[in-house]
């Protein structure tokens, strides 16, 4: 990303003059400089490239690219791109066009302009004012031969597509109306202009000739106060008109001739002219944003890329966010269809649903390093950066697209907007945060004011969105999920075991508040020792439960006083190393895995100065913290839930030592739970890591911890960047957030992962509605998961673990055995199979079919349901083979 700076220009001019004596430096100085201060070849993004030349026309549009499946077309009048499906004839447009509003005569012109835009940006000016620009109103409409604001270029060799560069910004041409001109400049302009331009130039300037020799003493004093160099040059002072008139002169007559007489921008030309005149006037920065977008036609659809390091704008403006193709595929003709959004497991939104509500869903969940941002509460997490839309058309049949964000998703979110009385068409698309900031209130001033503090640097990386097009029977959420599954797992081997898994999670050492002679202190207590964990495991096996994998938390001590230097050490009160090794081997002998949980991301906040050197920070400079659970359980506890976030670089530097510690126990796998459920940015000045860059470092941690996938891995929730490494995922969402405009939840995530990664929903014995969670687990192909401890409920009193008060294994043993027996009866045999289809048979009955031919029917209703002579009990399920 590049910004324009006056200081850089001055420095370069001085250097250039010095070098002229040695190398003959050119007098043309590039004023673009990268924000990171690195040396680089400065290139004007707007003019760099080979001009696009169409290979022909089709349907009245320029042909950009063509392959066996699709044709990419461009309307050069408004920059709209169309992808035509050769098989169905259906056309996907990057944005709406004028003809889409034929039945909307009363639509607001501003709303129409939004729909007709490919880009929408938000920036903040020097006063902190939020301003929104869209590419149609602020680029396409102002584009003409004299004022180019949209340019078309070829993609690099070997790529089929087009690069469109937009100059998106405000027209403040009146500010560039010259207050005066030297006589020489006037004459140069006059010669370069056409007859109408000459007339206008004379009209504004010819009567204003000022020469020091002809001025009276009184006039000299007055004129010199304004134009200090009047002794050296004769000038024409302007006779200014209205703002509209002056802007028209600049736009219609001055801009077209500047390229003929000057190698630079209008602003640079005028600044040099004012310097010659000795006229002190600082020209305003132009709120103009140069944004390049690369569109590449592929065999499967369209790839869209925005290289944010090539964005250009004045440094006095802060580009906060950028929407890329927010109206791609928007349906306007009343057809039926659904938007597919990554809300939890996935959700459908009918495109004909009207609602005043909308939602923005951040990919990979909330960034807890940004505390003042508004996030919707109680939302299920988005774990896959994808979204889609399907439409059924009477002429073209069923068509759909699924979009997958492959770079920049750490900065991104997807926005879903049902139609309203003002916005007549539903739409969804991605937004990316370019320059994060926090808002604070200044309480010390006479009147409280909001202050903005930005990260030291904006995000400078790629944004890439791949659109895959589907038709016919594949044009629904199932086809979309299969396409995404093939992207993540197309080259992976499936699971080998078909037996249903049982996940048993337990806790070792905790701290609880106790008192001695009136003094409160934190005493160590054991929820489940190693010997007790073994006993529970043996009892579960005796009860008929098999294929058990164990997650052992707090085996190095209470996680709320975690220290990364302590990770990998066995807490003394839990048992011996030999006992731990024996338990690990026992579980593995039976075909399962014992996953000791390694908390690599979070540390206890000690308050010491050294914490700042190896912990992540928020924008305002304080340490980034994370609680991970509701503060409702915090009452009376002396150990805070909030822990500090460890820098990814610090984790990588200590990881070899941690792995060596684990090798001494013979562990074949670990749980890195937090790494799969949270993604933290770091705003340390020296180690600034935007969320997208943090994602890449997380992947490095996963790669190193698992020795490139040789070790088994368990994570929580399962953000998609863990898919290459995860064997087991706990707490996968089994539903959506139940937003008012959502039609229903869908197993999108499960269709993507089933057969390749084992997973479970939330712990059954901690669920608010155990029966519903069990039914959902069966419908979505999830394994069973219980949290079981040896300690009695009273053990968690006055601790950070009050939420575990009902996890004593004696309380849940019989139910766990019964649940496993019932669920394994229908899910055994499908664990290595992908989900082939998912159907709603009636209001409360759903059927999931696997590629091996097995169908599992789940009845949520209160009455028995019959399917092809198979009876499905109320609140029950059956397998049909």
Predicted feature descriptions by range:
Residues 498-651, 677, 681:
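Aromatic-lined carbohydrate-binding/catalytic grooves of carbohydrate-active enzymes
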Residues 43-46, 64-523, 534-543, 547:
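Carbohydrate-recognition beta-sandwich/jelly-roll modules
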Residues 21-24:
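C-terminal motif of bacterial Sec signal peptides marking the signal peptidase cleavage site
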Residues 26-28:
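Bacterial signal peptide processing site
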Residues 2-11:
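Bacterial N-terminal signal peptides that target proteins for export
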């Amino acid at each position: 990303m590049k910004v324009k700076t006056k200081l850089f220009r001055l420095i370069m001019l001085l250097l250039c003059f010095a070098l002229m004596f040695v190398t003959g430096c050119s007098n043309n100085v590039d004023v673009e400089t990268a924000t990171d201060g690195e040396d680089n070849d400065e290139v004007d993004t707007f003019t760099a490239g080979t001009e696009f030349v169409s290979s022909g026309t089709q349907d009245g549009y320029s042909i950009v690219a063509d392959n066996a499946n699709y044709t990419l077309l461009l309307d050069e009048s408004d920059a709209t791109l169309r992808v035509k499906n050769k098989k169905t004839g259906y056309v996907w447009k990057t944005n709406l066009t004028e003809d889409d509003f034929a039945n909307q005569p009363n639509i607001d012109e501003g709303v129409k302009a939004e729909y007709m835009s490919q880009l929408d940006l938000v920036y903040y000016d020097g006063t902190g004012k939020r301003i929104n620009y869209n590419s149609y109103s602020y680029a396409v409409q102002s584009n003409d031969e004299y004022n180019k604001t949209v340019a078309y270029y070829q993609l690099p060799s070997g790529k089929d597509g087009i690069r469109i560069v937009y100059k998106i910004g405000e027209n403040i041409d009146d500010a560039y109306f010259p207050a005066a001109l030297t006589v020489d400049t006037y004459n140069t302009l006059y010669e370069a202009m056409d007859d109408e331009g000459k007339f206008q130039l004379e009209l504004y300037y010819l009567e204003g000739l000022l020469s020091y020799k002809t001025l009276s003493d009184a006039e000299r004093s007055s004129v010199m106060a304004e134009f200090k160099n009047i002794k050296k040059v004769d000038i024409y002072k302007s006779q200014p008109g209205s703002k509209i008139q002056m802007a028209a002169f600049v736009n219609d007559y001055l801009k077209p001739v500047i390229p003929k007489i000057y190698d630079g921008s209008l602003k640079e030309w005028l600044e040099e002219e004012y310097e010659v005149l000795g006229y002190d006037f600082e020209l305003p920065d132009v709120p103009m944003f140069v944004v390049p977008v690369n569109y590449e036609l592929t065999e499967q659809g369209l790839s869209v890329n925005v290289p944010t390091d090539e964005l250009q704008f004045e440094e006095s403006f802060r580009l906060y966010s950028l929407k890329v193709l927010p109206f791609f595929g928007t349906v306007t003709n009343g057809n039926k269809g659904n938007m597919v959004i990554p809300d939890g497991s996935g959700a459908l939104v009918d495109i004909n649903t009207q609602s005043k509500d909308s939602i923005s869903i951040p990919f990979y969940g909330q960034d807890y390093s940004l505390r003042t941002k508004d996030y919707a509460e109680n939302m299920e997490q988005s774990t896959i950066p994808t979204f889609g839309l399907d439409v059924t058309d009477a002429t073209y049949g069923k068509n759909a697209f699924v979009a997958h964000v492959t770079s920049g998703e750490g900065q991104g979110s997807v926005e879903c907007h049902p139609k309203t009385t003002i916005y007549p068409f539903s739409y969804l698309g991605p937004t990316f945060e370019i320059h994060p900031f926090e808002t604070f209130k200044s309480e010390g001033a006479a009147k409280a004011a909001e202050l903005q503090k930005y990260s030291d640097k904006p995000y400078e990386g790629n944004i890439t969105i791949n659109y895959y097009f589907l038709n016919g029977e594949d044009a629904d959420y199932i086809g979309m999920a299969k396409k995404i599954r093939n992207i993540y797992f197309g080259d992976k081997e499936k699971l080998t075991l078909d037996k249903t898994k049982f996940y048993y999670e337990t806790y070792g050492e905790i701290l609880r508040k106790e008192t001695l002679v009136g003094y409160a202190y934190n005493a160590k207590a054991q929820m489940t020792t190693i010997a007790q964990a073994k006993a529970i495991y043996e009892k579960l096996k005796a009860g008929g439960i098999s294929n058990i994998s164990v997650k052992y938390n707090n085996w190095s001590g209470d996680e709320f006083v975690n220290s990364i230097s302590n990770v990998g050490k066995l807490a003394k009160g839990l048992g011996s190393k030999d006992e731990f090794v024996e338990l690990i081997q026992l579980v593995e002998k039976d075909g399962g895995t014992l996953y000791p949980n390694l908390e690599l991301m979070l540390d206890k906040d000690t308050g010491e100065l050294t914490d700042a050197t190896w912990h992540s920070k928020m924008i305002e400079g304080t340490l980034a913290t994370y609680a991970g659970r509701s503060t409702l359980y915090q009452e009376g506890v002396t150990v805070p839930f909030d822990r500090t976030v460890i820098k990814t670089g610090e984790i990588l530097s200590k990881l070899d030592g941690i792995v060596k510690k684990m090798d001494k126990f013979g562990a074949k796998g670990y749980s890195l739970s937090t790494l799969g459920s949270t993604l933290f940015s770091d705003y340390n000045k020296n180690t600034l890591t935007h969320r997208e860059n943090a994602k890449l470092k997380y992947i490095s941690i996963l790669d190193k911890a698992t020795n490139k996938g040789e070790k088994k891995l368990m994570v929580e929730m399962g953000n998609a960047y863990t898919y290459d490494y995860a064997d087991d995922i706990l707490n996968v969402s089994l539903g959506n957030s139940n937003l008012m405009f959502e039609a229903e939840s869908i197993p999108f995530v499960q269709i993507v992962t089933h057969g390749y990664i084992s997973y479970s929903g939330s712990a059954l014995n901690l669920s608010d509605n155990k029966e519903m969670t069990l039914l959902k687990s069966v419908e979505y192909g999830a394994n069973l998961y219980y949290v079981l401890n040896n300690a009695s409920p009273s053990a968690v009193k006055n601790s950070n673990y009050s939420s575990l008060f009902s996890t004593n294994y004696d309380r849940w043993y019989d139910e766990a055995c019964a649940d496993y027996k019932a669920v394994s009866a229908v899910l055994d045999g499908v664990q290595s199979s992908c989900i082939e289809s998912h159907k709603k048979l009636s209001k409360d009955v759903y059927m999931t079919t696997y590629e091996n031919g097995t169908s599992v029917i789940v009845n949520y209703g209160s009455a028995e349901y019959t399917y092809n002579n198979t009876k499905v009990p109320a609140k029950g399920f059956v397998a049909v083979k």
